[in-house]
């Protein structure tokens, strides 16, 4: 893996790398610096979506979720961004025809929401919604 900051660095890296083929492609991702990362676990029955909550990672986006800590409720996000995260979560769960749990990871920078991952399954963060909460989030 290589992080590059300019077109020139990218071209240089590609030429120095092994030959790209269908079996060994070069994958390019945009790295969003100084962004906040959020985790959402939701439950969908195919018609309605229940969002257990939004967790904010303490570390900047880019730290693997298994190596990061998070807090509920999120502390560095506007109500408009929270609403957008909830809307995207519901739309994706319904469009993907999820029946059961779904986990989504988002990055937010300058109030712009980026979808990082969508996992049509439970995640390790799912239990965190029920542990500190007086309500049974996913019952």
Regions found by a protein language model. Give the residues of each.
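Hydrophobic pocket-lining residues within nucleotide cofactor-binding pockets
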Residues: 32, 58, 134
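Conserved metal-phosphate-binding beta-hairpin within the catalytic cores
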Residues: 28-30, 38-44, 52, 97-126
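Conserved beta-strand positions that form and line the central face of beta-propeller blades
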Residues: 3, 27, 137
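Single conserved hydrophobic/aromatic residue that forms the stacking wall/gate
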Residues: 129-139
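A long amphipathic alpha-helix within ATP-dependent nucleotide-binding catalytic cores
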Residues: 13-31, 42, 70-108
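ATP-dependent carboxylate/phosphate-activation module, predominantly the ATP-grasp catalytic core
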Residues: 5, 44-88, 122-131
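Rossmann-like NAD(P)H-binding beta-loop-alpha module
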Residues: 1-2, 9, 31-48
């Amino acid at each position: 893996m290589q992080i590059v900051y300019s077109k020139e660095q990218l071209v240089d890296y590609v030429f120095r790398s092994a030959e790209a083929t269908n079996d060994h492609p070069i994958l390019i991702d945009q790295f969003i610096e100084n962004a906040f990362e959020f985790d959402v676990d939701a439950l969908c029955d195919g018609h309605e979506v229940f969002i257990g909550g939004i967790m904010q990672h303490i570390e900047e986006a880019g730290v693997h979720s298994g190596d990061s800590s998070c807090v509920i409720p999120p502390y560095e996000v506007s109500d408009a961004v929270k609403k957008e995260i909830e809307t995207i979560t519901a739309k994706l769960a319904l469009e993907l025809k999820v029946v059961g749990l779904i986990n989504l990871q988002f990055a937010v920078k300058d109030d712009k929401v980026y979808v990082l991952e969508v996992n049509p399954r439970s995640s390790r963060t799912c239990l965190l919604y029920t542990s500190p909460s007086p309500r049974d989030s996913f019952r």
